[in-house]
Every structure is written in C-alpha cells, then in structure tokens.
C-alpha cells in the first residue's frame, strides 16, 4: 500500500512537471518556435484539433514561422485561430502557406511574460504540494489503520518529501531557463 501511494504520487508529480513544461513552452520568446502553436486549436469536422496536427510548422529564419496546412481548406481557420490567440502575432496567408513574423518583444512585454512564466511555475509547484499533501494523508491513514509499521510510514514520508523537493526543483529550473530566454535580447 505504501509503495502504491508513493508511486501514484510520483506519477502525478511527473505529470505536473510535464504540464508546466508545456505551459512554459507555449509562452513565446523573441525567437520563432514551433512549440508556441501547441495550444492553438481549430474546429476540424466537429472536433477541437491542435493546428500542429493539421499542418507542418517550420522555422526558416529566427523570426519567421511557416505553416503549411495538409488540407488547403484549413488555411483560413488556422490563420484566424493564430490571429485570435494570445500570441500577439499577425499571420499572412499567401494562398498555400501561412507566414507568421515574430515581432521583437518590448521590455515591458518581456517583464509581463516573465511574470506569466513565474505564475505558471508557481501553479505547478502548488499542484505538486497538493499531491504531496494527499499522499501524506493517505500514509497517515495507512499508519492509523495498522496496515504498515510506523518505521515504514516514516521512511515513506521522507521519500515523499525527497520526491516533492526534486520535482519542485525541476519546475524552478524550467522557470529559470524560460526567464533567461525571455530576458535575452
């Protein structure tokens, strides 16, 4: 029971770090990056589908992204979805492909994006701490019910604390890396 609780908690913490990694990747830096389009979806035959599954996305230059839809009729919906997203870019459609020029970030916009990155990192750390709290409650219940000895539960709690620290450190590293990317001119 203890091993299951620890395994389940670690799995959830890993997922929280993965979500944080995806969230941080969706924040645009001053450079072109295909990952910035991961969160943009369009309605494709009644299903909300990411544009990354409906087109090829290439970065021919540092500040230019070229999006080529697999189906020509998806050109307009993809262009509209990008324009309406929170990326702050203006796509141009030449009939076959969509070109997205990535404008230089202003100092104020960089600071806002750093705040946004820190906020997403803090959300992930709160999620990890909540997972830890629930696992600790489960370990206390196991101890109370007599399903495991006190030494085993104490050892499991220390392992859980170690895992919590490890995953929160990973989130801190991700945020620090993103902050460096954003502040780099």
UniProtKB/Swiss-Prot annotation:
InterPro entries hit by this protein: Ribosome_recyc_fac, Ribosome_recyc_fac_dom, RRF_sf
Gene Ontology molecular function: any one: ribosomal large subunit binding
Compartments, as annotated in UniProt: Cytoplasm
Transmembrane segments: none
Keyword annotations of the record: Cytoplasm, Protein biosynthesis
Any GO BP: translational termination
CDD domains named among the record's database cross-references: RRF
Keyword Protein biosynthesis: yes
Record-stated family: Belongs to the RRF family.
NCBIfam families on file: frr
HAMAP family, A to Z: RRF
Record's protein name: Ribosome-recycling factor
Organism the protein comes from: Mycolicibacterium gilvum (strain PYR-GCK)
